[in-house]
């Protein structure tokens, strides 16, 4: 049996990939990619994640762009507003943002899917490479998939 989604194919013989999809027990490594200022649900998600020490080792938070409403008229402004909101939330729960919160891309990836440089992108790549099949990095992306 195979699973298809937009050209991506996984067969039951792809045990490495399928094993990565299985729920893990214990502490998992994760980063959060979020357009926190866009809507309030991301703020709740960020705080819940930070308070879930017994299950999630949060290794970073990345500000994602947004521009779909009156809060931001372009992706860069949306990302900056989200970055500032992340800092405010962490301050309220007494968590340092140093080497933990990173600014994301200033524009959307778009249909060309070209690489856009940003501190969040570099940090995400670094953290992913630190992982392994036994200890993967989970990327919780609740904003635009641009970082």
Q: Which role fits each region the language model picked out?
A:
Residues 1-147:
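N-terminal acidic, glycine/proline-rich low-complexity segments
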């Amino acid at each position: 049996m195979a699973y298809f989604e937009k050209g991506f194919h996984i067969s039951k013989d792809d045990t490495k990939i399928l094993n990565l999809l299985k729920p893990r027990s214990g502490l998992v490594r994760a980063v959060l990619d979020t357009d926190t200022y866009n809507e309030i649900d991301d703020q709740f998600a960020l705080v819940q994640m930070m308070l879930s020490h017994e299950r999630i080792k949060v290794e970073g938070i990345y500000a994602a762009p947004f521009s779909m409403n009156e809060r931001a008229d372009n992706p860069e402004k949306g990302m900056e507003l989200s970055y500032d909101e992340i800092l405010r939330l962490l301050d309220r729960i007494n968590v340092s943002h140093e080497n933990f919160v990173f600014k994301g891309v200033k524009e959307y990836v778009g249909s060309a899917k070209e690489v856009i440089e940003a501190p969040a992108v570099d940090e995400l790549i670094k953290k992913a490479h630190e992982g392994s099949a036994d200890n993967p990095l989970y990327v919780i992306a609740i904003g635009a998939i641009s970082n």
